[in-house]
């Protein structure tokens, strides 16, 4: 027994089998082949029941919030607008009460105006900050442009201002040439052979050849 154990210990252990990896084709085939769809743990009827329950809870919450707002509004109105006691009041007392009510209305209007001014200011600041953010990001908001028909003269007038007339008057910058000068140039060009003969001294020889 001891010899067998010693022989087993002396022999080299066999190498483990190499792990076979799937090729790209195998992975592609595995991805494209149909697999059994996993069944959902919740049935369709159970899902419908849960959705209905969630909608009912949301509806109850909205109704509760609306009731709380109505109650809060009633409490505020009861504290600020107390019922008037007009029994046993004389003419002068009624006038004093009307003056007090008018003064309270004026005060409320002033407060409302101040609140509206603050809201308008905040809206303007928010719009300015939003535009600055767009500018920093490089996203410029395009303004709404209207199509306007305009002539070329009006466009040049708008672009150049007082220089529009000067730029449009192109003939003023051209050199004026008289008709007499043009005829003179044509006459000189037409007699170029005579001029060449006179300059070259060939007029006598030409007569000999012609004779």
From Swiss-Prot:
<keyword id="KW-0007">Acetylation</keyword>
<dbReference type="GO" id="GO:0003779">
    <property type="term" value="F:actin binding"/>
</dbReference>
<keyword id="KW-0514">Muscle protein</keyword>
<dbReference type="GO" id="GO:0060048">
    <property type="term" value="P:cardiac muscle contraction"/>
</dbReference>
<dbReference type="GO" id="GO:0051015">
    <property type="term" value="F:actin filament binding"/>
</dbReference>
<feature type="modified residue" description="Phosphothreonine; by STK4/MST1">
    <location>
        <position position="144"/>
    </location>
</feature>
<feature type="region of interest" description="Involved in binding TNC">
    <location>
        <begin position="33"/>
        <end position="80"/>
    </location>
</feature>
<comment type="function">
    <text>Troponin I is the inhibitory subunit of troponin, the thin filament regulatory complex which confers calcium-sensitivity to striated muscle actomyosin ATPase activity.</text>
</comment>
<feature type="region of interest" description="Disordered">
    <location>
        <begin position="1"/>
        <end position="25"/>
    </location>
</feature>
<dbReference type="GO" id="GO:0006940">
    <property type="term" value="P:regulation of smooth muscle contraction"/>
</dbReference>
<dbReference type="InterPro" id="IPR038077">
    <property type="entry name" value="Troponin_sf"/>
</dbReference>
<feature type="modified residue" description="Phosphoserine">
    <location>
        <position position="200"/>
    </location>
</feature>
<dbReference type="GO" id="GO:0005737">
    <property type="term" value="C:cytoplasm"/>
</dbReference>
<feature type="modified residue" description="Phosphotyrosine">
    <location>
        <position position="27"/>
    </location>
</feature>
<feature type="modified residue" description="Phosphothreonine">
    <location>
        <position position="79"/>
    </location>
</feature>
<dbReference type="GO" id="GO:0007507">
    <property type="term" value="P:heart development"/>
</dbReference>
<dbReference type="GO" id="GO:0006874">
    <property type="term" value="P:intracellular calcium ion homeostasis"/>
</dbReference>
<dbReference type="GO" id="GO:0019904">
    <property type="term" value="F:protein domain specific binding"/>
</dbReference>
<dbReference type="InterPro" id="IPR021666">
    <property type="entry name" value="Troponin-I_N"/>
</dbReference>
<feature type="modified residue" description="Phosphoserine">
    <location>
        <position position="5"/>
    </location>
</feature>
<feature type="site" description="Involved in TNI-TNT interactions">
    <location>
        <position position="81"/>
    </location>
</feature>
<protein>
    <recommendedName>
        <fullName>Troponin I, cardiac muscle</fullName>
    </recommendedName>
</protein>
<dbReference type="GO" id="GO:0030017">
    <property type="term" value="C:sarcomere"/>
</dbReference>
<dbReference type="GO" id="GO:0001570">
    <property type="term" value="P:vasculogenesis"/>
</dbReference>
<dbReference type="GO" id="GO:0001980">
    <property type="term" value="P:regulation of systemic arterial blood pressure by ischemic conditions"/>
</dbReference>
<dbReference type="GO" id="GO:0048306">
    <property type="term" value="F:calcium-dependent protein binding"/>
</dbReference>
<keyword id="KW-0597">Phosphoprotein</keyword>
<feature type="site" description="Involved in TNI-TNT interactions">
    <location>
        <position position="98"/>
    </location>
</feature>
<dbReference type="GO" id="GO:0030172">
    <property type="term" value="F:troponin C binding"/>
</dbReference>
<dbReference type="GO" id="GO:0097512">
    <property type="term" value="C:cardiac myofibril"/>
</dbReference>
<feature type="modified residue" description="Phosphoserine; by PAK3">
    <location>
        <position position="151"/>
    </location>
</feature>
<comment type="subunit">
    <text>Interacts with TRIM63. Binds to actin and tropomyosin. Interacts with STK4/MST1.</text>
</comment>
<feature type="modified residue" description="Phosphoserine">
    <location>
        <position position="78"/>
    </location>
</feature>
<dbReference type="GO" id="GO:0019901">
    <property type="term" value="F:protein kinase binding"/>
</dbReference>
<dbReference type="InterPro" id="IPR001978">
    <property type="entry name" value="Troponin"/>
</dbReference>
<feature type="modified residue" description="Phosphoserine; by PKC/PRKCE">
    <location>
        <position position="45"/>
    </location>
</feature>
<dbReference type="GO" id="GO:0060047">
    <property type="term" value="P:heart contraction"/>
</dbReference>
<feature type="modified residue" description="Phosphothreonine; by STK4/MST1">
    <location>
        <position position="130"/>
    </location>
</feature>
<dbReference type="GO" id="GO:1990584">
    <property type="term" value="C:cardiac Troponin complex"/>
</dbReference>
<dbReference type="GO" id="GO:0019855">
    <property type="term" value="F:calcium channel inhibitor activity"/>
</dbReference>
<feature type="modified residue" description="Phosphoserine">
    <location>
        <position position="167"/>
    </location>
</feature>
<dbReference type="GO" id="GO:0005861">
    <property type="term" value="C:troponin complex"/>
</dbReference>
